[in-house]
């Protein structure tokens, strides 16, 4: 079993029950899925860049990403409907717990001038989105093998009803929120 999953079952659930006074164990918010998205604007001019991004995302998450396409044509960006413009991975189960554990304990502390993640990036429905500026913070990515820096969005989808519940869940999991 994943290390983080055990921590959630033993420590986090008990703390959440006490803090919010849930009457039933099934009321406790939990992580449903983690979506890692990499939008690539340069894929319009350079389709080879998409292959490198897919390789990076595969190494980071341990799962093959799905390639995303443009929904609408935008003339200003020279974008046509159906063009490949990014990739994303949806993680659930043990792979999700392993990724979150690695992100919180290994990757985020490697970010330059890191003072914590913003506590304001909740969407009002208990989901949290985190933007990363470079893929180098992950231990699977070797500095010599990348062609350019690529950022990504990591979205934590929880079953929490409010942002406060989701913030507490992520804080107990180990997400280093910045003091504001």
UniProtKB/Swiss-Prot annotation:
Note the Gene3D superfamilies from the entry: 3.30.1440.10
Q: Name one GO biological process term.
A: translation
Q: Does the keyword Signal apply?
A: no
Query: Which Gene Ontology molecular-function terms are recorded?
Result: rRNA binding; structural constituent of ribosome; tRNA binding
Instruction: Check the record and name the PROSITE patterns matching this protein.
Output: RIBOSOMAL_L5
Pfam entry (one): Ribosomal_L5
Please give the superkingdom of this protein's source: Bacteria
- Give UniProt keywords alphabetically: Ribonucleoprotein, Ribosomal protein, RNA-binding, rRNA-binding, tRNA-binding
Q: Name one GO cellular component term.
A: ribosome
State the similarity comment.
Answer: Belongs to the universal ribosomal protein uL5 family.
How does it associate, per the subunit comment?
Answer: Part of the 50S ribosomal subunit; part of the 5S rRNA/L5/L18/L25 subcomplex. Contacts the 5S rRNA and the P site tRNA. Forms a bridge to the 30S subunit in the 70S ribosome.
* Entry function: This is one of the proteins that bind and probably mediate the attachment of the 5S RNA into the large ribosomal subunit, where it forms part of the central protuberance. In the 70S ribosome it contacts protein S13 of the 30S subunit (bridge B1b), connecting the 2 subunits; this bridge is implicated in subunit movement. Contacts the P site tRNA; the 5S rRNA and some of its associated proteins might help stabilize positioning of ribosome-bound tRNAs.
Q: Which PANTHER family match?
A: 60S RIBOSOMAL PROTEIN L11-RELATED
Read off the HAMAP family from this record.
Ribosomal_uL5_B
Q: What is this protein called?
A: Large ribosomal subunit protein uL5
